[in-house]
Amino acid sequence: MSRSYYRTRIKFCGMTRAGDVRLAGELGVDAVGFIFARESSRRVAPAEARAMRQAIAPMVDVVALFRNNSKEEVREVLRTVRPTLLQFHGEEDESFCRSFNMPYLKAIAMGGREEVNARTLQLRYPSAAGFLFDSHAPGGGGGTGVAFDWSRVPTGLHRPFLLAGGLNPENVYDAVLATLPWGVDVSSGIELEPGIKDGYRMRTFVEEVRRADCTVLE
């Protein structure tokens, strides 16, 4: 996706504490994510996410992440949390994803061996607001803390994409330069333990993304 200026969007995912949500806003992060996937160690209840939502700064997106949840589970989150963007990490098809009449990202597993084709993705999910390339294998979940080969990101996408999977303050500079993503998504790379973010790593991650943006513009 061609761009005449460059600012990589940043999403912090797997938030479980209001203080971390508040710091994300102070650092200028564009979106925070709450995980509702049943098997995730960072899963929060809708009521917990609603309480943390009060700490979100203005103009910061609230992303609700699902993986093979039922329609009723998704609707409960919509009613309780009022997210601005949905993110689907499972085997959800196009019909399921668009049935909630909200913008959504579809996560694509990059941990397998098969080639990921941009045209195929866009035909399979024509209503997606964008795609998120993560390092999990097909059928698996995200949050592994392991990066994939960034050269496998498909070319020819005509909508935004986010890079995820194993990103951290030590490698995100190189990741941005290698893939020029619309945005980056991080969870375990800024944590002390699952769901518990580290303020120093949060701040350093943002600084490294901005340093990469300045390099792109040179």
Swiss-Prot record:
Gene3D superfamilies: Aldolase class I (3.20.20.70). GO terms for molecular function: phosphoribosylanthranilate isomerase activity. Belongs to the TrpF family. The gene is trpF. This is N-(5'-phosphoribosyl)anthranilate isomerase. InterPro entries: Aldolase_TIM, PRAI_dom, RibuloseP-bd_barrel, TrpF_fam. HAMAP family: PRAI (MF_00135). NCBIfam families: PRK01222.1-2, PRK01222.1-4. Pfam families: PRAI (PF00697). Its EC number is 5.3.1.24. It catalyses: N-(5-phospho-beta-D-ribosyl)anthranilate = 1-(2-carboxyphenylamino)-1-deoxy-D-ribulose 5-phosphate. GO terms for biological process: L-tryptophan biosynthetic process. Keywords: Amino-acid biosynthesis, Aromatic amino acid biosynthesis, Isomerase, Tryptophan biosynthesis.
